[in-house]
């Protein structure tokens, strides 16, 4: 989130930093970027380091009147390298490094706005821009119980396997005889 009145223009731009570009983060530290670091910008200036930390120049303060909420997904490898390059590891960078499900971005922003209203911290005035051009499809893996038992050294029935897989949010598709992983499970292919 950022203070709308500290931003210039209505644009949100994602761009690569210039080599040796300086930026002051929310913690008051000046950071030196290279051209691999992604920056979140308004119409005129950088206001945050993508997936890592916002800028001091657009921070929320006690006198904030209007906030802009942003939900995004960035490439985990880029965030990890950028975080290391600038010497700043944050909760945000840790989450992005592991990979986030872009399908959850809209639900996350909706929940943040809902909480703002429920807590009496503000009023949501609406309006959303979605620039996500793709969604992630669930991964599908051929279900081969015999092969699984051989690999694990077990003698589980097909039904037992389906039950166990269901406990970790993996669904069985009878029509295709496949295990379907939810989109947030990027580790299953």
What are these regions (language model features)?
Residues 2-189:
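RNA/tRNA-interacting regions in translation and RNA-turnover enzymes
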């Amino acid at each position: 989130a950022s203070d709308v009145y500290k931003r210039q223009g209505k644009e949100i731009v994602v761009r690569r930093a210039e080599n040796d570009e300086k930026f002051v983060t929310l913690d008051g530290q000046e950071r030196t970027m290279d051209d691999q670091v992604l920056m979140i910008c308004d119409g005129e200036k950088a206001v945050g380091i993508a997936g890592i930390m916002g800028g001091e120049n657009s921070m929320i303060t006690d006198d904030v009147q209007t906030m802009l909420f942003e939900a995004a997904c960035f490439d985990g490898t880029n965030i990890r390298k950028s975080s290391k390059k600038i010497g700043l590891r944050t909760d945000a960078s840790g989450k992005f490094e592991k990979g986030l499900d872009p399908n959850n971005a809209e639900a996350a922003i909706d929940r943040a706005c809902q909480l703002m209203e429920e807590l009496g911290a503000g009023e949501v005035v609406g309006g959303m821009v979605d620039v996500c051009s793709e969604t992630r499809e669930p991964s599908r893996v051929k279900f081969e119980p015999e092969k699984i038992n051989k690999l694990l050294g077990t003698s589980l029935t097909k039904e037992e396997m389906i039950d166990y897989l269901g406990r970790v949010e993996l669904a069985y598709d009878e029509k295709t005889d496949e295990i379907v992983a939810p989109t947030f499970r990027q580790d299953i292919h």
